[in-house]
């Protein structure tokens, strides 16, 4: 007997589709891209540090389209984009609420959107490559024909805390003599 997968609430789906549409992303491609709409309960179930808010789960893949881990023998990497604004005590401050989160003690990973064929592109230095902050911006750029690697933040090409000076997931790209736009 197979386990039933819980279906996200209509609220999570509506918020997720609205976010993708606002980013100019074709919502019909969400599943193919590894984007999943989660309700608050599903979000919090992933890890105890996550707030019980609707979110967009962004799965990461290597250049071959296989799930990507941040470190050897680790589980598949993902990040969350909260789709709601927190209403807890901490949210009453003037600080901008955190929108993107990942599990504690995970390393940054390069995001290769699945709407581009990366395997040939990463080894062909004659083809230009773009790098941007944000997975959704990378998806949109690839959707428009601009091969773009996404980073979860402007410094997410390394992790001093984990002793990573250059992400292994970026090491698969032939960088020498390639035009790169950031």
Question: Can you describe what each PLM-predicted range is?
Answer:
Residues 1-60:
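Short, small/acidic-rich helices and loops at N termini and domain boundaries
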Residues 45-178:
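Phosphate-handling DNA/RNA-contact segment within nucleic-acid enzymes
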């Amino acid at each position: 007997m197979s386990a039933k997968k819980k279906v996200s609430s209509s609220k999570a789906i509506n918020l997720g589709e609205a976010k993708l549409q606002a980013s100019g992303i074709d919502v019909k491609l969400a599943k193919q891209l590894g984007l999943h709409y989660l309700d608050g309960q599903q979000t919090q179930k992933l890890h105890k540090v996550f707030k019980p808010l609707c979110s967009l789960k962004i799965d990461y893949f290597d250049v071959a389209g296989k799930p990507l881990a941040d470190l050897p023998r680790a589980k598949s990497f993902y990040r969350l984009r909260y789709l709601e604004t927190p209403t807890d005590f901490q949210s009453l401050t003037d600080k901008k609420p955190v929108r993107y989160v990942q599990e504690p003690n995970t390393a940054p990973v390069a995001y290769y959107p699945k709407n581009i064929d990366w395997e040939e592109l990463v080894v062909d230095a004659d083809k230009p490559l773009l790098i941007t902050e944000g997975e959704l911006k990378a998806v949109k750029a690839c959707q428009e024909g601009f091969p773009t690697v996404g980073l979860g933040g402007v410094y997410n090409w390394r992790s001093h805390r984990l002793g990573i000076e250059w992400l292994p997931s970026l090491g698969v790209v032939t960088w020498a003599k390639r035009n790169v736009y950031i």
